[in-house]
């Protein structure tokens, strides 16, 4: 599994690769928890590229409900259909048939969960269902999601039950802004995604930013590792490391120094308070201390 992920641009450690392999073979959802920017969402993207299955993403947020996650009716089109029927007189003498026509699949808007379940009917690769940042959703939605994941069925009262012929591959992610309930965790296999080791992060930078030299990749990874040790409000993730290496390469810098860090700090530090804290501690000390570790 590690080799497959690497072929598609994702360098995973053995533990993550094994968790993913088991989830695929056992047909279980995989819950990936970890800090923002640690590469959780990219796992689903890589799976989609590898398998050829459609990536269906459900972005969770506070207040999300079934109408955003499962399905809703296209009320605007239904209203137009109704007005057209009234204008032409078509079906107005058969109200039951008119109502039935309003609640046909033609007017059903399939949201991510229903798309993933209904999309397993053909013989092609199953969809990859990414339920992103489940920790942002509320308890009620989490309970509803648990019910759907138990049997991969969705009932639309007007149309009947949609049932997955083959369950989609399900990846859930959480930044742990709150604890995911134990019931959902029991339904899933679980893996904590930590920031990569220094050498692995260097390899990731070299893979994702091939124009970055080996020294730049090592210097950037070393400084990012030091920033993570400083207790910032939002420590940089792997995504920021990649962005930083790319920015430095675009500028044509051959090595990382205080001036380059100052000019490009916004690619790796995204909060003003964190930037002020880093500057107050001294950029020169940050660079020199980190480079002793990384070179």
What are these language model-derived features?
Residues 1-295:
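C-terminal regulatory/interaction module of P-loop NTP-utilizing enzymes
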């Amino acid at each position: 599994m590690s080799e497959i992920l690497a072929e598609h641009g994702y360098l995973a450690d053995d533990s993550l690769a094994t968790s993913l392999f088991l989830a695929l073979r056992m047909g279980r959802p995989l819950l990936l928890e970890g800090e923002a920017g640690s590469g959780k969402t990219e796992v689903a993207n890589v799976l989609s590229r590898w398998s050829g299955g459609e990536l269906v993403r459900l972005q969770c947020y506070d207040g999300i409900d079934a109408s955003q996650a499962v399905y809703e009716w296209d009320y605007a089109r239904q209203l137009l259909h109704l007005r057209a029927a009234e204008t032409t007189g078509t079906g107005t003498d058969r109200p039951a048939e008119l109502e039935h026509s309003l609640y046909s699949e033609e007017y059903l808007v399939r949201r991510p969960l229903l798309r993933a379940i209904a999309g397993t009917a053909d013989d092609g690769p199953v969809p990859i269902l990414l339920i992103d940042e489940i920790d942002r959703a509320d308890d009620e939605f989490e309970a509803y999601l648990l019910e759907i994941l138990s049997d991969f069925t969705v009932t639309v009262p007007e149309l009947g039950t949609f049932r997955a012929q083959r369950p989609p591959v399900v990846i859930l992610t959480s930044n742990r802004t709150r604890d995911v309930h134990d019931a959902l965790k029991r339904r899933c296999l679980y893996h904590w995604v930590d920031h990569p080791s220094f050498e692995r992060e260097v390899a990731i930078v070299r893979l994702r930013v091939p124009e970055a030299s080996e020294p730049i990749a090592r210097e950037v990874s070393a400084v990012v590792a030091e920033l993570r040790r400083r207790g910032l409000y939002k420590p940089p993730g792997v995504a920021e490391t990649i962005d930083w290496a790319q920015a430095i390469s675009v500028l044509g810098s051959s090595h990382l120094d205080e001036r380059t860090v100052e000019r490009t700090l916004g690619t790796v530090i995204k909060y003003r308070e964190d930037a002020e804290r880093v500057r107050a501690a001294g950029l020169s000390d940050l660079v020199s201390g980190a480079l002793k570790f990384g070179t």
